[in-house]
Amino acid sequence: MKKENIRIVFMGTPEFAVESLKALVENGYNVVAVVTQPDKPVGRHQEQLQPSPVKLYALEHNLPVLQPVKMKDADFIEELRSYKADMQVVVAFRMLPEIVWSMPRLGTFNVHAALLPQYRGAAPINWAVINGETETGVTTFFLDKDIDTGRIILQKPFAIPDTADVEYVYDGLMYLGAKIAMETIDLIASKLPEDSLDNVDFSAVLDGISAPQVCEDAELHHAPKIFKETCEINWNQSAKKVYDFVRGLSPYPGTWSTLCSIEDNGVKPLIMKVYKTDKSDRTSVGTPGTLVVEKTRLYVNTSDNLLELLDIQLTGKKRMDVRSFLNGFKDIEKYLFQTE
């Protein structure tokens, strides 16, 4: 069947999802509607409403937009059914109830930013970098009742350089995700008859192009949602662990640590965000969290080696390189990072 004859409802919210929607629209796929989150209140008094990146793109291209507060809302379900989608494509969206994902006859597939079954969860890109992985990728799979466990359709790997932060990996997987979304639709279309879908055994077709997730004996890494407390640096770990941790959360939301005065002089602790570090083969010369200042360079002792800080930001100040920070913060030797 030609791709133009498959009616697609696209579901997504952030910039990551826009690239996939854009690829479908620009390459002639038949996107009949878009589902995204409701506009979010922003501003000091929450008086303004900000549409999602996906909504903005959809409106620019005259695509109908649905923004349900609750995915089981009867009016939303009725409106969704009215588009008579053959297939639903999900990229960076919320959990879907069965009444939604089971609606189209060609199923609902998700583009997940990891090589499933590894890194099931809300933050797969972050956790892959945090764990020091050298490879991740994207997976398309059919949604089912459990999170990120459905039958796998296609997978594509993506190499993670040792110096890459999560922004680099995010961008790479965003474009790779758009490519695999199109290839998945093309694969499904290639297994369908040219004329009519009336007498097609859809279960047989979809099972024929997908396979159950196989866990074997490998340790499964999970990708839970990132919270502020998740981002606190533990200096009692190795320099490599801290280095990867910073990469995996930079530039957003950013890791942080509490800078405390060594002396009991009533000086208030400071919160420092750390955006970039560099590994060192020099052995630590003090307890974890204590600082080593060498002219324009700043190091932190970890459980094994010194870790150099390169790009930081104190609360209420602008982000800056360490050289600029040291020029304006003359008493840094009197501080250390909290480790408890």
Task: Give, region by region, the residue ranges found by the protein language model.
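Donor/substrate-binding cores of folate-linked one-carbon enzymes
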Residues: 6, 27-30, 87-222, 229
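Short beta->alpha connector loops
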Residues: 13-16, 69-72, 92-95, 280
